[in-house]
UniProtKB/Swiss-Prot annotation:
Belongs to the MnmA/TRMU family. GO terms for molecular function: ATP binding; tRNA binding; tRNA-uridine 2-sulfurtransferase activity. This is tRNA-specific 2-thiouridylase MnmA. Catalyzes the 2-thiolation of uridine at the wobble position (U34) of tRNA, leading to the formation of s(2)U34. It catalyses: S-sulfanyl-L-cysteinyl-[protein] + uridine(34) in tRNA + AH2 + ATP = 2-thiouridine(34) in tRNA + L-cysteinyl-[protein] + A + AMP + diphosphate + H(+). The keyword RNA-binding applies. ATP binds at residues 13-20, 39, 128. It comes from Neisseria meningitidis serogroup A / serotype 4A (strain DSM 15465 / Z2491). Residues 150-152, 307-308 are annotated as: Interaction with tRNA. Disulfide bonds join 104-200. Residues 99-101 are annotated as: Interaction with target base in tRNA.
Amino acid sequence: MNTTANPSNIIVGLSGGVDSSVTAALLKQQGYQVRGVFMQNWEDDDNDEYCSIKQDSFDAIAVADIVGIDIDIVNFAAQYKDKVFAYFLQEYSAGRTPNPDVLCNAEIKFKCFLDYAVGQGADTIATGHYARKEVRNGVHYLLKGLDQNKDQSYFLYRLKPFQLERAIFPLGGLEKPEVRRLAAEFNLPTAAKKDSTGICFIGERPFREFLQKYLPTDNGKMVTPEGKTVGEHVGLMFYTLGQRKGLGIGGGGEPWFVAAKDLTKNELMVVQGHDHPLLYTRSLVMNDLSFTLPERPKEGHYTCKTRYRMADAPCELRYLDDETVELVFDEPQWAVTPGQSAVLYDGDICLGGGIIQSTDKPVIITR
């Protein structure tokens, strides 16, 4: 197990999913004093068919009962709305594509939840993330999870050293099928529950319908790089770079992909073919930097992920100033998207990263 410490009192974030359920069961089995917390972080339209918060809370309570631990239900809805959801809407309004799970981890799971747990006398918090942690010479290192298909270090890159010191990831050395098998062995009601793919804490729902409740939309043209109109979009915020599905462009030839957004003209630029040169970039600029180690990485050669589950891309790190980094890739990268996170690695060590602001292609045009 990935504790790298000897905590006596651990509070587990129980989400109602299989991963956190097995996390709690493993810690209890290994003799730790364990309690659970279910975080209720979304209250808007919680009575509709898409939001699973109520069912998730029932599942978390059932898991706690089977494992034999106490569980508290704690409401962080106001903090979520202020720290995560407001940013989410702001980024979509600006034409970018945010990743709320990254901010949710930094602001809610490893800040609000951590503060609550410490206030309750806990030494450590545990979550069901597929990531590992090692302590070397007193320094806590965030490492990739052993299961390459499930590694979630990408979503944890904004954790600070003090947060890592108080966190453990018991599933980091396991693969998903093993976690499912353990859940069945522990007779957990979540053993066969499907993984969530919705927005962090909000659940799975039709995205366009959801976003329209909070932001105004305006239809506009889909155009080629030459300026030819080939279709109509239903609002720039509903599209992301590299998107293929849902464009509704007829005719023959290769599939169409989103290549850029022009906010001044309210136009969506589309190109034909996955390998169109406008979909590839050699460099990016990122800011809003956050690093997992006490010292930020030096300029040099690393690998990077610009989206979850992509293969590591070798790159050169250059500081433009204290708050801004340029990454130059060894090979062109496909559909690098402003608003997403670029996360740096040194081997298996997650060093941190930042928010992509621009690339060497004009993909978000604002003037």
